[in-house]
A protein has these predicted regions:
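Residues in and immediately flanking transmembrane alpha helices
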Residues: 15-16, 214, 471, 475
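Bacterial Sec-dependent N-terminal signal peptides
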Residues: 1-24
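Repeated scaffold domains used in trafficking and secretory/extracellular systems
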Residues: 222-224, 287
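Short glycine/serine- and small hydrophobic-enriched flexible loop segments
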Residues: 227-228, 291
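Beta-rich carbohydrate-recognition and catalytic domains
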Residues: 20-171, 175-221, 230-280, 295-299, ...
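Beta-rich accessory regions
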Residues: 233, 261-274, 278-286, 290-501
Length: 501
């Protein structure tokens, strides 16, 4: 026995390592994923007392959608997340049906408008969510927590808003100081309509107005939010209404936004000649903004679900976990000749966890340039001058015959993100895809920032004027990176790569 003991323990050790490494092949390192099981939309993004909360749609029992409950994670720096126990679980109704906790938001009721908390208590958290009874009803309900979201009580007079509809969901609530009221934005998905309600106590809601039947109506409307957003280089702000709905490419999902004015009752959009999308990739959906951010954040911050319902259930991340969340992104508006446009960037906090791995300046490329860095977890920033080149490409997650290709065509000003040869693509007929967006050069320059994290790519173009988020599932994991120029020489003005600790 003595003799075989070391072999036996080595065998058991290998077994444990093996079973842990296989499903972890695609596990992101700095994007939040639940330790196990299925996740979808972020819910109740709220800041309180030094903690950022990420509640999210979660199935505690498996890695497919079902038993929807609110999972919970917290972070002190929007960077590293700690998973906490399920906050709001699905529950049984007296008639034998179940109520699932669908998407919603969380607010801090610092004036105790709800009366749920002790007199003078300023840290009460209230969750506003859709109570969903499968095949029967969707209405809005509330729950409250006096211990920073660790334990919750459901309001005993739920639901607080019920239109008797089967599809009526995803409340997002803001405090509107001018009227000292809460304003809820919620959608009737099948009618492509958002509704605005107001309440003094989070319990009684009255309809203010409706907005809808315009913009992208190729898919149902979900997860709306209304946010006051600063306009860069001015003291002005505008209101942004975001709606999760269809994608520029038919039958995929994305988020669209409208910019306009909100007077406490009605949202009036600016004239827009085109549909505006928050992120041009296939995998950014259901993002909502944080509530109650401290003043030190001068811009709103959002987090989105990385996935597309088209194939979300089949992404090959192994048996343990499925779905993930974007990094926290701050956003603002830019005034352009065509109207206001969204600009988004990863929050600065991300930098604090990084270490510089490589940097170059003013390098001419003529053909292929292989970077002296390999990896699948990095933050790459590059400023390129195509000069005489007709096409420049950035190739990442590259191995023999495999790469995700970011390509810029100077003549057409088209930037594309091509994952058709990125690795595993056949698990679903609609996964293999190329995104295309128009990106004019700025003073002859193209600037890209790519957050790569095992299986997630978040690409920010021209300092956040465009964003593209996608899953990719490399097979060979060589992690090579190259830049190419075709048809002439191009110049890399600056390039840096940071690894993430
Ligand atoms: C969006 C969504 C929401 C709903 C939730 C259910 O992804 O369909 O409309 O509340 O997911 O999990």
């Amino acid at each position: 026995m003595k003799k075989i003991a070391p072999f036996l323990s080595f065998f058991l050790f290998s077994l444990v390592c093996f079973s842990q490494t296989i499903p972890q092949e695609y596990r992101p390192q700095y994007h939040y994923t639940a330790p196990k099981n299925w996740v979808n939309d972020p819910n109740g993004l709220v800041y309180l007392d030094g903690e950022y909360h990420l509640f999210y749609q979660y199935n505690p029992f498996g890695n497919v959608w079902g038993h929807m409950s609110w999972g919970h994670a917290v972070s002190k720096d929007l960077n590293r997340w700690e998973t906490l126990p399920v906050a709001l679980p699905e529950f049984d109704n007296p008639d034998g049906t179940q109520t699932m906790i669908f998407s919603g938001c969380a607010v801090i009721d610092s004036l105790n408008t709800s009366g749920f908390f002790e007199k003078g208590f300023t840290k009460g958290m209230v969750a506003v969510f859709t109570s969903h009874i499968e095949g029967k009803a969707q209405h809005q309900s509330i729950a409250y927590s006096a211990d920073k979201g660790r334990t919750w009580k459901r309001y005993d007079k739920n639901p607080v808003l019920d239109l008797g509809m089967k599809d009526f969901r995803d409340p997002n609530v803001i405090w509107y100081p001018e009227k000292q009221v809460w304003i809820m934005t919620v959608v009737k998905p099948l009618e492509y309509t958002a509704q605005f309600y107001e309440s003094k106590d989070l319990k009684t809601w009255s309809l203010l107005s409706e907005f809808g039947k315009q913009g992208d109506m190729t898919k149902i409307w979900e997860c709306p939010s209304l946010t006051k957003v600063p306009v860069e280089g001015s003291n002005e702000s505008k209101w942004v209404l975001m709606i999760s709905s269809g994608h520029r490419q038919k039958n995929y999902l994305a988020m669209q936004y409208f910019v306009g004015d909100f007077d406490g009752k009605t949202f009036t959009p600016q004239k827009q000649n085109e549909i505006l999308y928050v992120d041009e990739g296939k995998d950014f959906y259901a993002a909502i903004p944080f509530s109650n951010l401290p003043k030190s954040h001068t811009k709103p911050i959002m987090i989105g679900w990385i996935n597309d319902w088209e194939y979300a259930r089949e992404i090959p991340t192994g048996d343990t976990w499925r779905g993930g969340f974007s990094v926290a992104r701050e956003f603002s508006l830019k005034k352009t000749a065509e109207g206001f446009r969204l600009v988004q960037q990863p929050v600065a906090q991300l930098k604090s966890a990084q270490k510089e791995a490589f940097r170059i300046k003013n390098k001419v490329i003529d053909g292929v340039y292989n970077l002296p860095f390999k990896g699948e977890v990095f933050d790459l920033e590059v400023e390129l001058r195509p000069h005489r080149a007709k096409v420049v490409t950035l190739n990442v997650f590259q191995s023999q015959g495999e790469a995700t290709v970011i390509r810029y065509d100077v003549a057409t000003q088209e930037l594309s993100l091509d994952r058709t040869k990125s690795g595993q693509v056949n698990f679903h007929p609609r996964f293999s895809s190329v995104e295309r967006v128009k990106v004019p050069l700025k003073e002859g320059k193209l600037s890209l920032r790519l957050l790569a994290d095992k299986s997630i790519l978040e690409l920010f173009v021209q300092n956040g004027e465009q964003a593209l988020t996608e899953w990719v599932f490399p097979i060979q994991h060589e992690g090579e990176i190259s830049l190419t120029s075709e048809g002439g020489k191009a110049n890399i003005s600056a390039l840096s790569i940071h690894t993430i600790r």
